[in-house]
UniProtKB/Swiss-Prot annotation:
UniProt region (N-acetylmuramoyl-L-alanine amidase), positions on chain: 199-775
Protein name from the UniProt record: Bifunctional autolysin
Subunit annotation: Oligomer; forms a ring structure at the cell surface which is important for efficient partitioning of daughter cells after cell division.
Residue segments, region Endo-beta-N-acetylglucosaminidase: 776-1255
Native source organism of the sequence: Staphylococcus aureus (strain Mu3 / ATCC 700698)
Length: 1255
């Protein structure tokens, strides 16, 4: 059970994951139950640990309710949440609501919009809306958006001297007269409700809608804001692009309680919104934000109820972070500002916050990254001011637009395109909105079904409606997703069972309701009488009949899904080509003996084992075949005309002695059906890859709609005379042949590479380029030019700028005596500037004056495969070609006379640099420091047995059918960084070859130079060891140390620094295992695991299960084994040996036992009963199922959350002081020694290490 090991109190409410219990022995460790909720830390800047799972689920559900994207509902009846009220609005004498002060007064003609009025509510969040005009009925939309720059990376374009932003006095005008007052609380029981809906009007060219609201008076002059208003720009629907593995931590005030929003820009002129998001997802451990915005889209990338890592340790627990993606023309920039303002106003409105600029006093709800740097610290970035100024725009203008958007959404000023009343008119007879039902409103999730009675009160759009609307949807079964109680009335929200389309709210007394459990997948055959009715839904009515069972006598019903409604079981399946639901009472299990013999043999396949697996291949159906099968259980297939065509194969299935392929249309998701293996010509296929290559092709060559296409799939023929240009954009390997997709003369299609002429490859040589590279000369282009150069920053320089327009540069000392890539060049005035890029991440750093640099031309990288000897006198291995002494990875002495394996080369000015590997490190060496080997006499040694598991380190290498052969070699790209289990070794011509098994089970030969005994990756943290140690030592709850056994005291700075010193730890053979990647299986042989598990109780001989679990869920095998051994007392605990829970009591002698080997859900109050209950619910009736199922839980819960080493769990170097799993400074050391001990006993070593590096 979780937590049976050392319940000591050194965690201070940090959550310790269940899987970390593997090493929870020794000092200061606590294993809380896996499903226990995390509590918020009381650590000032670290109050960001995820709230309880129930709170999280409730919050996600509530958020989803207000973010449900809907279609345009103008003039359409739609479902609304119970919180939405539709007030009446009066039509008064009107004037033009176009902004008049500092804004053009031209009338803007647009679509007729709904009138709007609103009341505010401080007791519940306001539903998000993205409409900048009067919001339409049910403007529940999704959120999105962010741009990617690592806040913790010092090498960023954002890092600009804060002094470059003038701290002008805060304009009093920004404290607008429209500033939303705090909502007034009512004394009555009915909660106040904010509404964004109004009577929807159909779109037409009718008169402009009228409103009694005042017009907005801009507080700053802005031609761009005027352009936005005059053109009545609309914000796009917010898209959601969430990533499951992003961590979810609460803000310092709790889940769903941000304090404001921060304006960022991406600092990358070349990026796109998709590129930024893609990069962020791959590097989220360093930084991720909530949303990205450009001129066309708003994409929310992380739920705004939880914090993100975008603005430093102080700001992250407080603010929503949103990035502006760079645009390059006036209209696009204006749209992006409109989109950002609308998104920001939506967030403020949703979370009950009012716009309040923090730019000039460090207090408020709207911040720039610069303001966070200036007033809060934890970051030194100054965006977005430089980017905004480059478009003649300012933060004050953006804030004014946010404020206006907010006031429009809150119903305090007139929307754009409407008319306003010059003086409010008092109606002769007061008209007040319908008063909603009184009483407290409660809404809860529900998972049931209901049938609406013939006599009913109708469907309600909201539970506040006085009357429902008549409906014909009676005596049908619907799904129920919510219940709501308002006063004494109870309602159900009903929706279509199959599509999820919501119909509306119905009163409890108007339905027949039943509870329902969630459907589960099954694979079972039953016997069913002909004539039995099938239904479109479980518990269906006569209005939901899907059909009747045809035939005579009993038929076979193949069930694929099951659901319990109240106490009845319903199954979904197929019979004679018809599908539907039927009560289990009408089915007979075919496994049971029949009372009389059946003259015809029963379906033989139902008693055979079915195995199904994914497949990536292609197939052509033979002209003679057995037809297409709807399921592999079918006795006969249906005739098909889809013969002699190429289809994609997505699955293969084996049933009894038959093997089937599932074929689908190659270009669409349309499934064709199952075909027998003997009825097709099958070929393996690799996944298509994007390419950008030009070939020549002869006229008349056929193009096909699919790769390996047949005459029935011709897309056309190449026209013209003589060779034509074929521009390829995609490539796929089918068996051993390559096919390319491209365009020629306006026609597109696939063609075999054999019909294409490949451009000559560049020569691979270390010799100096044939043509001398011209010396770099300064040019002064009028616009920004893309260049390929490389530069060294001089020790004495004038500094770095965010843009060429910055008058004052930030100190550039940190970049001095270092080499960087140059990607852009621009003249400004009489000076020329170039944009330097980070060498490892290709992230722009900033602009330098060329006078501060030594610049050379940079050639194109060329692949090469050559082995060299490093000269005794050399300049070392560098991180970058033409690198300086500050960028040396290995000094000259460390690589002298060593073997350097080159993989690519590039020219820098007149020199050539090669990139390759030496001493297990990769980097650049000047060609002058290398000597090519002399030819050796061919020699071949006999192959000998050799058992060792290596790691494939060169994805550009190959594996071979026979060693030293170029005729049968295949790319290692798909196996890069995967284990390779070697069984033989052979030396041929001085090259060592290893024969072994790839991760997919295939046997192959690989060169020793493409393998490594271990794969170590070094990650730069961007901080010094002193800085991170100071953060840890300064936490409110101090790191702990035992100077006297059993007595805990606060650790001092030196204790922490010593414990965090990665250089020292990496040199220790045992402590190095702090850096072992726990999310990377090593393919340790099952035999070795079983040898180790001998005598370990029920875990004995479970090597196959641990191996399967590791491969399926990407978890280190030793880590899993260690965890299981500690949790089960070496496999002897009753929880591991198994039991059953009957009538809520544990029964250990039952026929069926359920096992729990990781202690999941084994809560302290009754660990055995709770743990067995969980195992029973999960179906773990064997030890192997408990191992595999438990591994899934562990992997999904913690290891994949980013902190995938013991060191990261303890110290979290990406965000020091936050989300750490222990307080004992020796915690990672103790656990690393334990894991190393297990490796030694198994007879293996760790293969994958991830080591943080400090400056």
């Amino acid at each position: 059970m979780l937590g049976v090991i050392n319940r000591m109190a050194k965690k201070f409410n940090y959550k310790l994951p269940s899987m970390v219990a593997l090493t929870l022995v020794g000092s200061a460790v606590t294993a809380h139950q896996v499903q226990a909720a995390e509590t918020t830390q009381d650590q000032t800047t670290n109050k960001n640990v995820l709230d309880s799972n129930k709170v999280k689920a409730t919050t996600e559900q509530a958020k989803a309710e207000v973010k449900n994207p809907t279609q345009n509902i103008s003039g359409t009846q739609v479902y609304q949440d119970p919180a939405i009220v539709q007030p009446k609005t009066a039509n008064n004498k009107t004037g033009n609501a176009q902004v008049s002060q500092k804004v053009d007064t031209a009338q803007v003609n647009g679509d007729t919009r709904a009138n709007q009025s609103a009341t505010t509510n401080n007791t519940q969040p306001v539903a998000k809306s993205t409409s900048t005009t009067a919001p339409k009925t049910n403007t529940n939309v999704t959120n999105a958006g962010y741009s990617l720059v690592d806040d913790e990376d010092d090498n960023s374009e954002h890092q600009i001297n804060p002094e470059l932003i003038k701290s002008a006095a805060k304009p009093a005008a920004l404290e607008t007269q429209y500033k939303a007052a705090a909502p007034k609380a009512k004394t009555e029981a009915t909660p106040k409700v904010t509404t964004f809906s109004a009577s929807a009007q159909p779109r037409s060219v009718a008169a402009t809608p009228k409103t009694s609201l005042p017009k907005y008076k801009p507080q700053v002059n802005s031609s761009i804001n005027d352009y936005i208003r005059k053109n009545n720009l609309k914000a796009p629907k917010i898209e959601e692009d969430y990533t499951s593995y992003f961590p979810k931590y609460a803000y310092r005030n709790g889940v769903g309680r941000p304090e404001g929003i921060v304006v960022h820009d991406t600092a990358n002129d070349r990026s796109t919104i998709n590129g930024e998001i893609s990069y962020m997802k791959n590097n989220y451990q360093n930084a991720f934000v909530h949303a990205f915005v450009d001129g066309d889209r708003i994409i929310e990338t992380a739920p705004t109820d939880y914090l993100s890592w975008g603005v430093g340790a102080v700001g992250n627990p407080r603010f929503i972070n949103v990035e502006i993606v760079h645009t390059h023309d006036y209209a696009s920039f204006a749209r992006s500002m409109n989109n950002y303002a609308d998104y920001a106003a939506t967030q403020l409105q949703y979370y009950g916050l009012k716009p309040d600029s923090a730019e000039y006093d460090g207090n408020g709800t709207v911040w720039t990254h610069y303001a966070v740097s200036k007033y809060l610290g934890g970051t030194d970035h100054a965006d977005p001011h430089g980017y905004l100024r480059s478009h003649n725009y300012s933060y004050d203008q953006l804030y004014d637009l946010i404020n206006e958007k907010y006031l429009i959404k809150m119903g305090k000023v007139a929307p754009w395109g409407t008319q306003f009343t010059t003086t409010p008119t008092t109606p002769s007879k007061p008209t007040t909105p319908s008063k909603p039902s009184t009483g407290k409103l409660t809404v809860a999730a529900n998972n049931g079904v209901a049938q609406i009675k013939p006599t009913n009160s109708g469907l309600y759009t909201t539970v506040y409606d006085k009357t429902g609307k008549a409906t014909n949807e009676v005596q049908k079964t619907f799904a129920v997703s919510k219940t709501a109680t308002l006063g004494n009335q109870k309602f159900y929200l009903v929706q279509d069972y199959n599509s999820g389309n919501k119909f509306g709210w119905v009163k409890e007394g108007d339905v027949v309701y039943n509870t329902a459990k969630s459907p589960v997948n099954v694979n079972q055959s039953y016997s069913i009488k002909s004539g039995t009715k099938l239904y479109t839904v479980p518990w269906g009515t006569s209005k939901q009949v899907a059909g009747s069972v045809s035939g005579s006598g009993n038929q076979t019903f193949k069930a694929s899904k099951q659901q319990q409604i109240d106490k009845s079981i319903y199954l979904y399946g197929s019979v004679n080509g018809k599908s539907g639901w039927v009560s289990k009472a009408y089915l007979v299990d075919t496994a049971k003996p029949t009372p009389t013999p059946i003259p015809k043999p029963s379906t033989p396949t139902t008693n055979n084992k079915l195995t199904v697996s994914s497949l990536n291949g292609v197939a052509q159906i033979n002209a003679k075949n057995n037809g297409l099968f709807t399921t592999v259980y079918d006795k006969t297939g249906k005739p098909t005309k889809e013969v002699q065509k190429t289809f994609a194969v997505t699955k293969e299935a084996s049933l009894g002695g038959n093997k089937f392929y599932l074929v689908k249309d190659y270009n669409s998701p349309t499934l064709i059906g199952w075909v027998k293996q003997g009825d097709v010509i099958y070929n393996n296929a690799k996944s298509p890859v994007n390419v950008m290559q030009t070939y020549t092709v002869k006229p008349g060559t056929k193009l096909y709609s699919v790769p390996w296409g047949t005459y029935k799939q011709e897309a056309g023929a190449v026209s013209g005379t003589g060779n034509q240009t074929f521009k390829a954009t995609k490539q796929q390997q089918i068996d051993k042949s390559i096919y390319l997709f491209g365009t020629v003369n306006g026609k597109s299609g696939w063609v075999s590479k054999a019909y294409l002429a490949v451009p000559a490859a560049p020569k691979k040589a270390v010799a100096q380029p044939k043509t001398a590279v011209k010396a770099y000369t300064v040019t002064k282009p009028q616009t920004t030019q893309t260049v390929s150069k490389i530069a060294q920053v001089k020790p004495n320089n004038t500094g770095i700028r965010a843009s060429v327009y910055e008058k004052t540069a930030k100190n550039g000392a940190k970049y001095a005596d270092r080499t960087f890539y140059v990607t852009k060049e621009r003249a400004h005035g009489n000076e020329t500037y170039v944009l330097l890029n980070n060498t490892s991440h290709n992230i722009p750093l900033g602009w330098f004056n060329v006078k501060d640099l030594n610049v050379q031309n940079l050639g194109k990288e060329v692949k090469t495969t050559q082995k060299y000897t490093v000269n005794k006198s050399n300049n070392g291995l560098s991180m970058v070609p033409w690198g300086t002494k500050n960028q040396v990875i290995l000094t000259g002495n460390n690589i002298a006379q060593g073997t350097f394996n080159a993989t690519k080369q590039v020219s820098v000015g007149k020199d050539v640099y090669l990139y390759g590997t030496i001493n297990n490190r990769t980097g650049w060496v000047n060609a002058k420091d290398l000597t090519a080997p002399t030819a050796v006499k061919p020699t071949t040694s006999a192959a000998k047995d050799y058992n060792y598991t290596y790691v494939i380190k060169n994805g550009n290498g190959y594996y071979y059918v026979t060693p030293n052969s170029d005729t049968a070699k295949y790319s290692l790209k798909a196996f890069n960084e995967q284990p390779f289990a070697v069984v033989k070794e052979q030396v041929i011509n001085g090259q060592t070859w290893y024969y072994g098994k790839l991760s997919n089970g295939k046997l192959a030969w690989i060169k020793s130079t493409d393998l490594a005994k271990e794969l170590i990756k070094y990650n730069q943290t961007g901080m010094t060891l002193n800085q991170v140690a100071q953060i840890q030592a300064g936490l409110q709850y101090k790191p702990q140390v035992q100077r006297v056994p059993g007595k805990w005291t606060d650790a001092n700075f030196n204790d922490v620094k010593h414990a965090m010193d990665t250089k020292r730890l990496a040199q220790d053979p045992a402590l190095k295992y702090q850096f072992l990647r726990l999310d990377q299986p090593q393919n340790i042989s099952i035999d070795k695991i079983n040898q180790f598990l001998k005598g370990k109780g029920v875990l004995e001989n479970q090597g196959a299960a641990f191996n399967k679990a590791a491969q399926m869920y990407g978890i280190n095998e030793v880590y899993l084994i260690s965890h299981a051994l500690l949790e089960t007392g070496n496999g002897t605990s009753q929880l591991a040996k198994g039991a059953d829970v009957v009538n809520n009591k544990v029964v250990t002698n039952s026929n069926t036992k359920y096992h729990n080997v990781f202690g999941i859900a084994a809560y302290d109050n009754d660990p055995l009963r709770e743990g067995i209950k969980y195992a029973k619910q999960a179906g773990w009736d064997t030890v192997s199922k408990a191992i595999v199922g438990g591994a899934k839980f562990i992997g999904n819960s913690y290891v994949k959350a980013g902190q995938n080493t013991l060191y990261k769990m303890r110290w979290n170097p990406a965000h020091p002081g936050t989300h750490q799993y222990a307080t004992d400074v020796d915690w990672a050391n103790i656990n690393a020694k334990i894991i190393k001990g297990y490796y030694d006993k198994i007879g293996e070593v760790g293969k994958y290490f991830d080591i943080p590096q400090y400056k």
